[in-house]
Swiss-Prot record:
Protein's name in the database: UPF0754 membrane protein Tery_3973
Source organism superkingdom: Bacteria
Compartments it resides in: Cell inner membrane
Protein's UniProt keywords contain Ribosomal protein: no
Disulfide bonds: none
TM helices/strands, residue ranges: 4-24, 385-405
InterPro entries per UniProt: DUF445 (IPR007383), UCP032178 (IPR016991)
Membrane topology: Multi-pass membrane protein
GO cellular component: plasma membrane
Species assigned in the record: Trichodesmium erythraeum (strain IMS101)
Similarity annotation: Belongs to the UPF0754 family.
Keywords from the named record: Cell inner membrane, Cell membrane, Membrane, Transmembrane, Transmembrane helix
Coiled-coil blocks: none
Amino acid sequence: MSNIWLYFVPPIAGGIIGYFTNDIAIKMLFRPYRPYYIFRRKLPFTPGLIPANQERLAKRVADTIMGSLLTPSELQNLARRLLQTERMEAAILWLLQMSLDQLKLNTDTKSTKILANILRDLLGQSLPRLLKVWAKREYFLEAQINQIFDQILLEFQLTEIQAAQLSDWLLKVVVPPDVLRKTLIDFLTDQNISIIDEGFREKASGTYWVVANLFGLRNTLTRLRTFCLDERDLTNQRLMELITALAVKERITEWLHSLSMQNLPVSTVRELRNTMQNSVRLYLQENGTDLIQALSLSVAWEHIADLIINRLQASSIMNSSLELVSRELALILERYLERDLENIVALAIPILNIDQVIIDRIKGTSAEELEVAVNVIVKNELQAIVNLGGVLGVVVGSFQTILLVLQR
């Protein structure tokens, strides 16, 4: 009976010792989680291997990852895969759609005020400075002014109704009979009457010379002036009758209707066009800044911004053009990244500080959590090591049994 125990005890004992030795060794990688003290002296192997060297382990892991895995070239490849044109286009399209949806849902005046301030600064501050510089160029607005002159001014002609209305306004407002009467009185001064009378006497000939030297015009013109002064209403009536009898309104209407730059000589038209260009350019150089600023002050930018936002909210073109805009922006970014991706990654690595993130994450993880994480990853492998220890213990015990048998 004792011989039987002698044969079986070594393999069994070796297996048990090997199994539990490996199991204890694996557990001692993490346990105990904290140090233990006896008489103020720390016990050996407390805490476990990994908790005791967690900071150094974190540094080694970070160095390994940054030195072998996340190298600058690998980060560049990762950035290229992440920033493919299709992905960038989809991201930009999503951002634009989100912005448009937010704009549609926006009910406060924040967006309106921002857009109003942008428009006010653009027209009231930036545009005047640019206009002052542009106006110094010789051919500034030449094509636009020529187009306005050729298509609008050159072909402009009043219709018969417009000419009749303008002539009626001239005779009723600008030069009514009373204005003509006052103008005639102001013209018929004693000096002008004397000049007219002397000129008539000197230049008259034939029967007119007899009339001029016998009667003259002095008395007639003086009496006319006196009549205009004393008989105001009657003079206005006579002037109105004279205007009607001479068909002045019809003549002015006909003249205004036929008035057109196309009837002028070509050289005159060219000169007018050049004069218009120079006048506009000179005016913008001298007064363009004040004009734009005054115009900016007179515009209700909040109202215009509100109209623009409302128009954008209801515009179908905005929705249809988002894909095109996102595609163009993605292509621009792609060309930029092809040129400067290496520099961007080199600048991003210190900013991201990935190695420090890894160190902080490992140092901030408790030993218990590390043990759980390792067991989740290599549970079967660790159990195989434990089992291998038991198998090796059995093998060693079996060799001992064989040696004992041979010694007998």
